[in-house]
Amino acid sequence: MGNIKFLLLVFFLIVVVVNGCWEEERNALLELQTNIMSSNGELLVDWAGYNAAHFVDCCFWDRVKCSLETGRVIKLDLEADFGTGDGWLFNASLFLPFKSLQVLLLSSQNIIGWTKNEGFSKLRQLPNLKEVDLQYNPIDPKVLLSSLCWISSLEVLKLGVDVDTSFSIPMTYNTNMMSKKCGGLSNLRELWFEGYEINDINILSALGELRNLEKLILDDNNFNSTIFSSLKIFPSLKHLNLAANEINGNVEMNDIIDLSNLEYLDLSDNNIHSFATTKGNKKMTSLRSLLLGSSYSNSSRVIRSLKSFSSLKSLSYKNSNLTSPSIIYALRNLSTVEYLYFKGSSLNDNFLPNIGQMTSLKVLNMPSGGNNGTLPNQGWCELKYIEELDFLNNNFVGTLPLCLGNLTSLRWLSLAGNNLHGNIASHSIWRRLTSLEYLDIADNQFDVPLSFSQFSDHKKLIYLNVGYNTIITDTEYQNWIPNFQLEFFAIQRCIALQKLPSFLHYQYDLRILAIEGNQLQGKFPTWLLENNTRLAAIYGRDNAFSGPLKLPSSVHLHLEAVDVSNNKLNGHIPQNMSLAFPKLLSLNMSHNHLEGPIPSKISGIYLTILDLSVNFLSGEVPGDLAVVDSPQLFYLRLSNNKLKGKIFSEEFRPHVLSFLYLNDNNFEGALPSNVFLSSLITLDASRNNFSGEIPGCTRDNRRLLQLDLSKNHLQGLIPVEICNLKIINVLAISENKISGSIPSCVSSLPLKHIHLQKNQLGGELGHVIFNFSSLITLDLRYNNFAGNIPYTIGSLSNLNYLLLSNNKLEGDIPTQICMLNNLSIVDLSFNKLYGPLPPCLGYLTQTKKDAEISWTYFAENYRGSWLNFVIWMRSKRHYHDSHGLLSDLFLMDVETQVQFSTKKNSYTYKGNILKYMSGIDLSSNRLTGEIPVELGNMSNIHALNLSHNHLNGRIPNTFSNLQEIESLDLSCNRLNGSIPVGLLELNSLAVFSVAYNNLSGAVPDFKAQFGTFNKSSYEGNPFLCGYPLDNKCGMSPKLSNTSNINGDEESSELEDIQCFYIGFVVSFGAILLGLAAALCLNRHWRRAWFRMIEALMFYCYYFVLDNIVTPIKSRWYKNVG
C-alpha cells in the first residue's frame, strides 16, 4: 500500500511539473519580451499576446523549447532578421531565471553592449549553458571575448559580424576587464569568429587554453599564411575554415602537417599558388576534405602540389578556371580522392574523356560551370564505382552516350538544365541503371514516354524530375506496375501533357508532387491525396482542372503546401479545410472561379501563406482572418474578389503578418490606428471603399516597404507621422480626397515610387522635391500644386517618370531637368508654363537604362524552391524573419504603373512595356519660341506632344531622326514654313498632327506611314496643299474662317472679343446712319415709322395693363374684402 501511495505521489509530481512550464520562467519570458526587439523596432515575439491567450503552457510558445522531463526552458531562439534597428544593451539578469538553459541564440539582435554589471560574464550562473550564438551584433570582439570567457560550461560559441561593421566601445564597458584573468572555456569544442578582419590569432587567448577545440571558423578575416603555425595551440583541431582571408602565395606544408588531427580545411577565396614543402618529404595523413578555388591564378600548379595530402578523400575547387589541359593529369596523381566538387568551374574539353583513370572516384560534381559540347562515350563512362554525377546547368548538347549504362553503381544523376535531346526510351541505358535513387533530367529537350516503362526494372528510385521536356504517348506499356515508391515526382511544364501517367495510381509514398504548368483537364486528382497519406506538398497550378475541389476522406497530418492556382475550379471553398489538413502551411487557390463566402475554418494554427485572390468570393471575411488571429499567418492575399464589410477591426493584431493584399474588393470602414505599427512589409488596400483619415504612426516603423491606398474615399491630410516609416519604398495614395500639402519630411524617406495623383493636394513643389536621390516615379497629376518647378529637381538622379500634368505650375521649364539622365517619361501638360523650350531636352531619353519597373521585394524562382520550402519549414520553426527562403517563394507583383497620353488616348504602362516606353508631353501650356533642333536627337522617343502652345518658326528637319517615334503632335501653335520631307522616313509613326498652324507648301506624299493620315492631321493650315487636303497645289488656297487657332486660349479669346466689339460698333453705326438717311429723305417712310412706334407703345401699355396690373388689383381687393 505504501508503494502505491509513493508511486501515485511521483506520478502527481510528474504531471504537475511536466504539464506546463514553471511559473517563474513564464513570468521571466513575459518580462524578457519587452526587451527583445527585432531589427525593425517591433517586438520580436508576442508571448504576452497570442501565445499567452492560446497556450497557458509557455513550453508551446514561439521560440521556446522545454525539457520533456522537467518542463524547464532549455532553449531560447531569439534570432532576429537582418535590419537596421536601434542598438540595445544586454541585461544578463533577464536570462538568469532559466536555470536549465542550454542554448541561447541572439544573432542579429543589434546588441551594442550591456548595462552596468549585467554583461555576458554573468551568464556563468547558468551551469547548463552549452551554446551561445551572438553573430551579427556590433560589439568589439576583444571586449566581447573578455566577458564570455567566464562561462566555463560553453561548448559552442558563435561570433561574427558583417565585414563592413566598425566598432566603438560604449562607455558602459569595463575596459580593464581585458587584463583580468578569467576562468577560460576549457570545454569549448566549436568556435565561430567570422568577419572581424583580424590578423592576430592571439586575440582568442582571452578565452584561455582551448585544448578541446575541434571546430574553428575564421572566414572573412585578414589572416595570412603564418596563421597555420599559430594554430598549434589547438591540438584537438579537426575542422578549420579560413575562407576569404589574405592567404597568398605558397603555403608551407610543414605548418599544416603539425595540425595532426585536422580532417577538414577550407581555403577557398584566397590566392594560393601552391602547397610547398621546404623541409623533408613529410605527408599529411589526417586531412580528408580540402576546399579551394575562386581566385587562384595557376590552378594546375595548385593541384599538382596536393600530393602531400596523402589521405585526401574530398577535393572541392569552386568558381575557377580549370581549362588547362594539365589539370586532368594533376588530378590523376591524387589516387585517394573519391569526391570531386567543381561547382561553377569551367573545365577543359578533354576532362571527361580522360578522367576514367581516377578509378576510385565515387562523386563527380560539376554544376553551373558553363561546360559545353557533347558528352563523350569514353573516359567518364569507365568510372565503375561512381555513385553520384551532377552536370546541372551546363551547356551540354546532343544525345546521351550508350556507355552511360555502364555506370551500374550510379545512385544520383542530375542532367537538368542542359540542351540534351532524344527519346529516353530508345535505348537500354535506364534499364541498366537500376541502382538509381535520384534522377533529374528536367529542362532539356528529351522526349519522355508517358508510360515511364523504361523504369520498370527500378526498385530504389525515390526522386524523379522530368519537367520542362516533351511528353510523348506510348500506349503499349500503359498498365505496368512499378517496383519503386517515389517520394518526389515532378513533371511540370511539359509539352503535350494532357493526362497524368498511369503509374501514379500505384504510388503511395509521395511527399512532393509537382504537376503544374501542363494541359491537365477534368476534376482535380484528389485520389493522389487519398493514396499518398504522407504527402507534404502538391503543386498543381497553371492547368485546366475544373469542378469543385473535394477534400480527401481522411485527415492528412503531413500536408503542408497546396497550390491549385490558375485553374478553372468552381463552387465553394471546402469547409473545415483546417481540420482536413491541420499542419497546412501554405494554401494558394487564386485565379480560379471559386464563389461564395470564405469558410471560417480555413485558417489553421500553422497556416503561413493564404492566397485566394482573383476569384468570385463574396460576403464578409471570417473573424479569424479579420483580426489575423492565426499566430503564423505571414502572407494573406484576398485581392480581386467581391468581398465586403469591415476587414479591419479594433482587434486587428497581425502577429507576424507581413504581406496583406486586399485590393479590388468592396471593403469599407476606417483604417485601424495600429496598421502601421504591425509587422507589415506590404499593405495593398487599393480600389476599395475605405474612408476616414489616414492614421498616424506614433513611432518608427522599420518594416513597412510598400503602402498602396489608392482609389478609396480617404480624406484629410497626409499625416506627418508617415515620416516614421523609415524604410518605405512605395507610397501610393492616388485618387482619394487627400488635401493639404505633402509633409516636407517625406523627402528624407528612401522612397522610390510616389503616386499621389488625382487628389486635392496643393502648395509648392519646392517643399516636396529636395533630397529624393532614390526616387524613380513621381506622379502628382491632377492636383493643385502651384509655383515654379524647383531647380532642385536636378537632384533626383534616379528619376525615370516625372508626371506633373493638370496642376497650376508656372514659369520656365528649368534646365536642371536635363540633368536627369534616367528620365524616360515626362508629362507637364495642362499647366501655365511659359518661356522657350530648353534645347537640352533633346538629350533626354537617349540612354535607356534598366529602370526598376516593379515594387518587387522578392523574386520567384520555382526550381527546387517548393522542396526547399517544405524541408526548411520542417527544420526551422520561426520562418518569418528569414528573407532567404522568401526570395525563392514570392513575387510581389505590385508593379509600377504610369499613365501617359499618346496617340490621342491615355494609356497605362507597366511591366516590360513601361521599361521601353519614352515620351514627352508639354501640351496646353504657354511655351513660346522656336522648337530647338536638338529635339531631333531623341532617337529613342516614342511620343512627343507640343500642341496648344505659342511655338513658332519651322518644324526642325532633325525630326527625321526620331526613328522610334509613334506619336507626334505639333497642332495648335504658330509654326510656319513647310513640313520637312524627311518625316517620310519615320516608319513607326502612327499618329501625326500639325493642324491649326501657319504651315505652307505641299504635304508629304501619301505613302508609307503618311498614307494612313487623313486631312484632320493638316486642317487649319490654309496654305497647305496636296492630298488628302481639298487644296490642290498650284491653285489659290481656300481660306478657312478658323485658319489660325492659337494654342493660348486666353489670348485667342481677347483677340476675338476685340474683333467683335469693332465689328459690332461699325455695323450698328452703319444701320443707324442708313435708317436716319431714309427717314429724312422720304416723308411717307417717316410717317409710317412714327405710326409703327406709336402702335407699338399702345400695344405694350395694354399688354402690361391686362396681364400684370389688373390681376394684381383683383387679388388685392379680394384679400381686403
Swiss-Prot record:
One of its GO terms (cellular component) is plasma membrane. Residues 21-1058 are extracellular. Keywords: Cell membrane, Glycoprotein, Immunity, Leucine-rich repeat, Membrane, Plant defense, Repeat, Signal, Transmembrane, Transmembrane helix. The chain crosses the membrane at residues 1059-1079. Residues 1-20 form the signal peptide. It is a single-pass membrane protein. Residues 1080-1121 are cytoplasmic. It is found in: Cell membrane; Cell surface. Glycans are attached at residues 91, 224, 298, 321, 333, 372, 406, 531, 576, 588, 689, 771, 822, 937, 945, 976, 998, 1014, 1041. Pfam families: LRR_1, LRR_8. LRR repeats lie at residues 98-122, 126-152, 185-209, 210-233, 234-259, 260-282, 284-308, 309-331, 334-360, 383-406, 407-432, 433-457, 459-479, 507-531, 556-580, 581-605, 607-628, 630-654, 655-678, 680-701, 702-725, 726-749, 751-772, 773-796, 797-820, 822-846, 914-938, 939-961, 962-986, 988-1012. One of its GO terms (molecular function) is pattern recognition receptor activity. GO terms for biological process: activation of innate immune response; cell surface pattern recognition receptor signaling pathway; defense response to parasitic plant; immune response-regulating cell surface receptor signaling pathway; pathogen-associated molecular pattern receptor signaling pathway; plant-type hypersensitive response. Its main location: membrane. Interacts with an 11 kDa glycine-rich protein (GRP) of C.reflexa. Interacts with SOBIR1 and SOBIR1-like kinases; presence or absence of GRP has no effect on interaction. Involved in plant defense. Contributes to resistance against parasitic plant C.reflexa. Acts as a receptor for the 11 kDa glycine-rich protein (GRP) of C.reflexa inducing immune responses such as emission of stress-related phytohormone ethylene, reactive oxygen species (ROS) release, and hypersensitive cell death. Recognizes a specific pathogen-associated molecular pattern (PAMP), a cysteine-rich peptide 21 (crip21), from GRP located on the cell wall of C.reflexa. Belongs to the RLP family. This is Cuscuta receptor 1. It comes from Solanum lycopersicum.
